[in-house]
Regions:
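Helix N-cap motif at beta-to-alpha junctions
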Residues: 233, 285-286, 366-372, 416-419, ...
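Conserved nucleotide-binding/hydrolysis modules and their immediate coupling elements
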Residues: 209-314, 324-326, 337, 491, ...
Length: 609
């Protein structure tokens, strides 16, 4: 018989990038007494990965739990970026309700829509938390209207439309049920969660059933499966059967060696756990997302949503440039292969396969440029050295044999005086303008339907066009018929003619031809790209050239040569910049752009074909 666990609430926190959900979880942890009074707490404690802290984004879902009065609240912090949307869908299987965090100034953004749609489809209870209400330009009343409009657009039922609203400033540590209430602490949000989110239910006497929703990885115990116990209970040393809804051939008999629940930011070992609890199990070597842990006598798999397919791919290959192996710790094909396949343990939206017909090369597919650039940055920090190609979209074909390509819905906020150039550029990239509305502060919001490949390499150009004041957000929409060819880069490259060290005299002559990416003293090799040509063709330049010494005195003393500071490209800018016949060489210390074919004559022959 089904019973409710009134002492547990399972919630997910969902929001758009940078609307403050991780800060909100920090504040809930602090005010529930999870940390000791004298304990130093890092800001945004939930983002444990360096890149997450630096970029201010959440990449992997995190689990934590707090105790409020006598209720244990399991909280899952989900990524807000569309590239990590694969994480969100699965995590929602574990919870009975969501707290939707919306910025009091920015209002509803595309990712809010993406995640909310998933939550409403699964009939989850929603609490709307309007955050950052202490911002001077906050407009909470208008944002409430925007949210209700969004609910109606997403076909929410009456019960879902009648959701509670909470007004908060996670940074200042207070929440209110009404804008006129006293600004005290987070208690109104705690009460709202306990009173409005249903308790998990299940049958404690039935056979065990638990769906694995996320995978954690630990060097000591290996793979750890995390999920919610739907029925029955789990005990340490219990023998269970692993089955999978989409793959009936999976049937494995295994033993649970360790069982953990969550408390604060820590995993706590327990001997037994019952229905409604979110637990982690270790000791099962090849456990995967979507597997169901069942009792031996009645193994029934729980159905689950298949993970969204990747839309972009890049080739990762062994670095074969003349400077290969000088800066990295892990440089061989085996190192690269092991690291990429290890990433599959934790990142389920990723696909890795060996590139057919190409030695030492792996095709890595993901949900977007950010998804793959985070992987590249992580590997770089770990000491790996490799080369990557330009991102390409993954095409499908329909039943009539027509080519289909992934489409994105892009929301773009730009200053009013920049709208013309942005619309023109996106139209050239096969974008279709769907809507244009003025918003506060002299900005216009543009809505485009655009092929995913139209956005590859555009973000850097966009920031230049809007003088750094534009915001661009996009979410995957689906596959449509191929829209035709897009010409990407309008500029050619300045290519190094010979190998050696860059010298001021050579750079001084080269800088007249375009913008340089390198400074004096840097090592270069023939075929490496050292700058950008304002015209469309590639030009070879000799940056290692020295001044010829003669025994004739100069009529005027040599003037000191003045170099323009080089344009140093970040990882994202370099990935945006490279063309289809180029590679990005990634090492722990450097990023170098090069031609795929380094030799000048061989490259000339290949281009003539």
């Amino acid at each position: 018989m089904k019973t409710k666990r009134e002492d547990i609430r399972n919630i997910a926190i969902i929001a758009h990038v940078d609307h403050g959900k991780t800060t909100l979880v920090d504040e809930l942890l602090k005010q529930s007494g999870t940390f000791r009074a004298n304990q130093e707490v890092a800001e945004r404690v939930m983002d444990s990965n360096d890149i997450e802290r630096e970029r201010g984004i959440t990449i992997l879902s995190k689990n934590t739990a707090i105790t409020y009065k006598d209720t244990k609240i399991n909280i899952i912090d989900t990524p807000g970026h569309a590239d990590f949307g694969g994480e969100v869908e699965r995590v929602l299987k574990m919870v009975n309700g969501v707290v939707l965090v919306v910025d009091a100034f920015e209002g509803v953004m595309p990712q809010t829509k993406f995640v909310l749609q998933k939550a409403l489809d699964m009939n989850l209870s929603v609490i709307v938390c309007i955050n950052k209400i202490d911002r001077p330009e906050a407009r909470p009343e208008e944002v409430i209207d925007e949210i209700l409009e969004l609910f109606i657009d997403l076909d929410a039922n009456e019960e879902q439309l009648d959701c509670p609203f909470i007004f908060a400033s996670a940074k200042s540590g207070y929440a209110m049920a009404d804008l006129n209430d006293e600004k005290k602490d987070m208690q109104p949000l705690f009460d709202c969660i306990v009173n409005n989110i249903p308790a998990p239910e299940g049958d404690p006497d039935a056979d065990t059933q638990m769906l694995i929703s996320t995978i954690d990885y630990n060097e000591f115990v290996g793979r750890i499966g995390v999920g919610k116990i739907d029925n029955g209970s789990l005990k340490v040393n219990q023998e269970v059967m692993i089955v999978n809804h989409h793959d009936p051939s999976v049937k494995k008999r295994v033993r649970i060696t360790k069982l953990y629940t969550f408390n604060g930011l820590n995993k706590v070992e327990v001997n037994e756990a019952g229905i409604g609890e979110i637990v982690a199990v270790s000791g099962i070597a090849d456990i995967h997302i979507g597997d169901t842990i069942c009792s031996l006598n009645n193994p029934v798999a729980i159905p689950f949503q298949k993970i969204s397919e990747p839309t972009l791919s890049m080739d990762f290959m062994v670095n074969d440039s003349p400077l290969a192996g000088k800066e990295g710790k892990f440089v061989t094909s085996r190192h690269l292969r092991d690291r990429l396949f290890k990433e599959l343990n934790t990142d389920v939206s990723l696909r890795v396969e060996e590139t057919p017909g190409v030695e030492n090369s792996f095709k890595v597919s993901g949900r977007g440029e950010l998804h793959l650039s985070v992987l590249i940055e992580n590997m770089r920090r770990e000491g790996y050295e490799f080369a990557v190609s330009k991102a390409e979209v993954l095409y499908h074909t329909d039943e009539r044999g027509k080519k289909l390509e992934p489409m994105e819905l892009a929301y773009i906020d730009v200053p009013d005086d920049c709208t013309g150039s942005v619309i023109q550029k996106l139209s050239q990239r096969k974008g279709e303008l769907l809507g244009m509305t003025p918003i506060n502060g002299g900005y216009t919001r543009l809505q485009f339907s655009i092929p995913s490949r139209g956005l590859i390499g555009y973000r850097g150009e966009f920031l230049t066009d809007t003088k750094g004041n534009g915001i661009i957000n996009s979410s995957f929409e689906g596959y449509e018929e191929y829209k035709g060819d897009i010409s990407y880069r309008k500029n050619g490259s300045l290519i190094a003619y010979e190998s050696g060290d860059a010298i001021t005299y050579g750079l001084f002559n080269a800088q007249e031809r375009g913008t340089l990416f390198i400074g004096p003293g840097e090592k270069v090799y023939a075929g490496m790209i050292v700058g950008e040509n304002p015209r469309t063709e590639d030009i070879e330049v000799n940056v290692c050239k020295t001044k010829h010494l003669t025994n004739t005195r100069s009529s005027s003393a040599d003037e000191a040569l003045r170099l323009v500071p080089p344009k140093i490209l970040s990882l994202e800018q370099a990935l945006d910049y490279i063309d289809t016949d180029e590679l990005l060489e990634v090492t722990p210390k450097s990023l170098r752009i090069r031609k795929k074919i380094l030799d000048h004559t061989a490259r000339y022959r290949a281009n003539k074909k």
